[in-house]
Amino acid sequence: MNNNLHKFIMYRVLTNIADDYLLASTMFFKGGTCAVMLGYLDRFSVDLDFDIKKGSNKNTIDEHINKIFNKLDLKVNVKQKEKLFYTVKYKTKENLQSTLKVSVSDELCESNVYKPYKFDKIDRTLICQDLPTMFANKLVAPLDRFKKKKIVAGRDIFDIHEFFISEYPINNAVIKERTGLEFKAYIKKLIAFIEKNVTEKTIDQDLNYLLDYEKFNKIRKVLKQETLLFL
């Protein structure tokens, strides 16, 4: 993957979403790319993830999103209209990954808090999960991803580690709503999951292309243990 080109494509899509009144008012930016662009995480991120405003018309949103893809000459390879999930392909040199995933989730969490943030990279403002909400959802992500997809993602552990190092606040209500557990009970469950399922191989496979070489080699041996200590 050409990281600079991929980042440029993401910025173009985000700029057009911000300039579309309907999308900007009904799609709320979240996830790793959002955290990276706001300076909360120091890694590369490859997908665009959003929450959808309650009561929004998914068909209308789908139409507006596809207009942006057409405008930017992005070919839709995979489309799940009922889930508002898209994989689009952009032009690049041969033999390089050149796909971007855009996901708009309608699995609403009433405890999520959203606010507008200015994104200097694109000179636009987007409504996003606020920082405590983002951290809470990061903590829920490892078990939620494994439950839905049977996948263990090293980036989930890295993000939790980085958020703890920065001493970011946590919206405990999100954890309670999404897991049905109080904070301490959920953290106990998360610790057991990490101890059992996160391996050095998991970390290496997921993070080697998301971190620069120096940072990757510095963190890979200690990430699991340090994260468990934080928890």
Question: Model-found features: residue ranges?
Answer:
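Structural signature of FAD isoalloxazine-binding scaffolds in flavoprotein oxidoreductases
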Residues: F50
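Conserved donor-binding loop and adjoining core beta-sheet/short helix segment
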Residues: F44
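Glycine-rich beta-strand-to-loop/alpha-helix junction loops that act as flexible
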Residues: F29-C34
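Structured mid-to-C-terminal alpha-helical surface segments
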Residues: M1-M27, L38-L41, K53-L231
